[in-house]
Regions:
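Conserved short strand/loop->alpha-helix "switch" segment adjacent to the catalytic nucleotide/phosphoryl-transfer site
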Residues: 23-42
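Acidic ATP/Mg2+-coordinating residue in the GHKL
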Residues: 75
């Protein structure tokens, strides 16, 4: 999974001034995940949102063991408003409380990313980061499902 995430990040590094920090030190899976366009596109949507809302940095962590694979995407932006968190995953929602109206649209990218990933076995959790100031998206798969894609 690391190779695919790195490929996605490289595409953003070419167009973004933000710093992407990737940690795969706890990625112990040895099996190759089939490159499904739906998974790549879904992850790319969430990395794109992090890039859009981050102030300076996007943190991506990949963890895996013999049971699970997890990707965490965090930014150092303002995080999700309560209004957005209550409706996350619905298309075309906008936060009326977000200061920068040019960045307030949120729904369609998350809706598409969430739908694509969930249809490919992922559990998708969107929340405010527990360790940073911004938003966090947690993507989790059971390895037996990833191997069968």
């Amino acid at each position: 999974m690391f190779d695919y995430v790195r490929e996605i990040i490289k595409s953003f590094e070419n167009i973004s001034k933000k710093e992407f920090i990737i940690n795969n030190s706890q990625d112990t899976n040895s099996f190759k995940v089939t490159k499904l366009i739906e998974i790549i596109y879904g992850i790319r949507n969430f990395v794109g949102n992090a890039n859009k809302f981050a102030k300076k940095k996007i943190y991506i962590s990949i963890k895996s063991d013999n049971q699970m694979t997890e990707i965490s995407i965090e930014d150092d932006g303002n995080g999700y408003s309560k209004e957005v968190l209550n409706k996350i995953g619905e298309p075309y929602i906008k936060s009326s409380s977000y200061d920068d109206k040019s960045k307030s649209g949120l729904g369609l990218g998350i809706f598409i990313g969430k739908t694509l990933l969930e249809r490919n076995g992922a559990k998708v959790i969107c929340r405010n980061s527990k360790t940073r100031s911004g938003a966090e998206v947690l993507l989790t798969w059971k390895n037996k499902e990833l191997k069968n894609l």
